[in-house]
Amino acid sequence: RVCRKAEEAAGLPVRPCYMYALTREGRKPPMVHVRQSLYSLLEPRKKRGNVVNLLGFFSPLVDDCELYDLLHQAGVKTIHEISACRDYEEYQTMSEANFNLVLHPEARFAAEDFHDRLKIPFIELTRLYQIDKIGSQYRAFGKVLGVTFDDQAAAESAQKAVDAFKAQYPETAFAVGECMNGDAFELSLALVRYGFKVPEIYGTITAENFIYIKQLAAISPETRAYSNMEPTMLYYDGENSGVNMAIGKDAAYYHQNCPNVMWNQDRQPYGYAGVRRLFEALTEAENRWEEQP
């Protein structure tokens, strides 16, 4: 009834989206429901073979993300992101996509709705910070599309940023939080594999990230994982943690006496560009910290 009255008043389609905090740990938490509702107004249209939708985030990818170029290599002419749509009509053109690319697991239900209602299939990619795994994922993606991507320059640029930071700050020991653009456990695994220490992680264990936890346990058994939802974290004392740099807003809160990178910007880091930008940001944060009087 409320939606109908709103439609009459605004002259625009309106859909309800319920935000129940108690569903946070359930099958369809609030952010999953929001993503699903965002696309519920799309109407069927004739499909175009050179159109792709990127699903998963409420803001676009960073503009130098190599994924755009790789899609163009595959013959894609138009890449839609809901946050970049200028008006309702452009939003409706998302129904013309040949397929959807799911970049965040919380958009999976939305992609399934696309498939059921609009007959648009989807492919899911994971945001990663391990350079070799990013390459493997792109190769698998290219195989599905029947193309071989040229991602060498982007991969080398990311590796160069990692190497430059490591050469300047080889003894960095990270605290990695979950309030940032990435999975805390996957990013921690990447940092350990790059040769850094990760004494502490603050994150929520899920089915998706358990594989990273198992790998971390094998190569960095001294790493400790904490839950931000645990009330006793109010008394957390990181003085003897060995941490000298923090990634994520929560990690920065726990470790206020060392340099940090919030890494929670609106434009979404992704792929090799995400790795490169992260290590450039880490280098900049360390440099600023050293320049303090």
Region locations from a protein language model:
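An N-terminal assembly and electron-transfer interface module characteristic of large anaerobic redox
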Residues: R1-P293
